[in-house]
């Protein structure tokens, strides 16, 4: 908080962490993670600081365990609950029915969780929707196209329509 953070996401994965939509994850004991959530909640100094508790147990231990963990983390002081990696509309709806709001979900392009519109997800009970790699994937595709063009043509000629101008970029980052 002293560094200006307004919140934190605490995950129950073991180290080294993997993307929640990848195989090969494992989770710590639920009570161990709940203790971390409780410590974060107890450390709040009265200022509004949002604690999001994420569980990856859906993939490792199934829905019942993921829901149990999420409820345990709520009891420990989490403000927002986040069950990572639902694989269907039915799983999303079940999470929305069984857990108290507010709820968070990640939509990873090409990942496990099917994409729905923001209104639909809100109706299912989700208030926070993370498109966590969409911008990265778009930027990577643009970089790949640009450097392939440079390799093939030796210049950026013909790319100006797909690029920001020098002035546009400086305006975007607030440099005069």
Where are the regions a protein language model picked out?
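Extended, intrinsically disordered, low-complexity segments
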Residues: 134-176
